Structure formats: structure tokens, C-alpha cells
Amino acid sequence: GTSSGSGGSSSSSGSGSSSSSRGSGSINSGGVSRGISTGSPGIQTTSTVPSGQMFGGRTVGGGMRNGVYGSRTYGSGYPGNNTTTTGKGTTGRNFPYFFWPLTFGAGTASYVYHSDSEYGRPDNSSRPGGPLYTASFQGQAANETFRVLSDNSTMDSLADSLAQYCAIYIRARSGATPYSGANTSSPKPEEVIQYYRASSVALSLDGYNNSAVFTDDESAPDTPLPPLLNMELLNCLNQSIGAHVPLVGEYSTAADGPGLGNSATRVQVD
């Protein structure tokens, strides 16, 4: 199912980012400062990163809000690619949402680990939005812990939206803290239950162990989620991330509100 979200608290600004608690701010992507907003519908047009800039020759833009949902596979969440028709991983990909894919550090499957050499470690301050941060959320019913992972600027503005829309389902939540990698802390790639925005945002469940993460075989099935007592919280987080994850572009009233209607995507629970 899906729903709207809850969130961690804001974090200090990373060097790649600048954001405000009102859900807007800016990032540096492709050598250009670009405004972001939790109410942006996205940018339909694409442009090419100039030579001399990081990832010169790749394209940025083209991703809209109704295409932000991926799957549990690293390399999903790209427009028109809600599964992984172009393969696991993010090597050589363009940037439809301007943000870079997440990285998890060493000790992960090869197609995940290789992203470190391309996009830097989780604490890389050159990434659009700054270093990676994570925040945790616990529901009312049990000790199930969900985590959201993304760049600092995204976490700073998304947290307010999540807290606003999912407060009724949250028993406890942490503020956003720097993410040091899967070697030392959650979330780990095998704990991710949903990727968003070209694999630049992830929602995870502590203790979930998706065996498909440990193989390059694209036909390997995902491990089913365990029975959950906090489905309302999971649904709320999932839909609110989709509805309010910051995108490049200006605020639009058409993108406002807690839900995505028909464009919401279900987290697979069996």
C-alpha cells in the first residue's frame, strides 16, 4: 500500500546544499545552482552537463513527480523504468532528477559498491544536496524501525512534510544524522524496501534482508517483507515521500497535498 509520510528533523547544511524548513532551497547540479521544492512537479526538459564539469556529457532533467517511484532494486526509480529494464546499478546513468544516486560504502554487492567510485562515499560533500543523512521512524504498535536515506538538503525539507502528514502513526522518530555507510549503520542496501527519484532516496526497514541484493542476477526475486504491525506508518511514509520529495523546479499548487492519487505506487508486501 501507500499513504503519506512522516519525517526526521532537519540537519545542518551540507556544502552541496542550501535549504529552508519551508520545503524549498537549492542544490548545485552540473555546475549550476538550481532551486528545489517539495511542491515541484519536476522538469520535463533535459540539458547536457558541460564538459569540464563533473559527469560532463551526461544529461540532467526530464524526470517528473509521477515517475519518482522505483522498486526495491538499486537502479530503479528512473522515469519509465520502475523495474530495472536497464539493469541493476547506476553506473553511467543520466540524472533525470538532477540528484546523484545513493552510495552505501564497502561490503555491498558489486553493482552497489561500484557506485562509490563513481559518485563518492556517503560523506561526499560534492554531491547535489550535500552528504547523505538518515532519519528513523517507529510506529505505535511495535519496535519496527523505518529509515529514510537521502542527501542533506532533501532530508532537511522532506522531514517537515513527513512529520506533518504522518504524526498520528509515529511513536518515536530521530533527527536526521550523517550516514557513514552500511558497514557501520543502517540502512543497508538489503534493508531497502523502496527507492525513489532515480535511486537518490530510499526507505528501509531495520532487519529486513532482501537476498536479491547480493546477486547481479536481475531475475532474482525480492525477499517478501515480514508481517508488519505498522502498515499504516509504512503506507504513510511511502506516499508522502512520493508526494513531497524535493524536485528541481518551482512550487506548484497542483503538486500540493498529502497524496499522489492515481500516481501513487504500492510497496510490495508479498
Give a label for each model feature.
Residues 110-270:
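Terminal or extended low-complexity segments
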Residues 77, 82, 106-108, 204, ...:
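Amphipathic alpha-helical interaction segments
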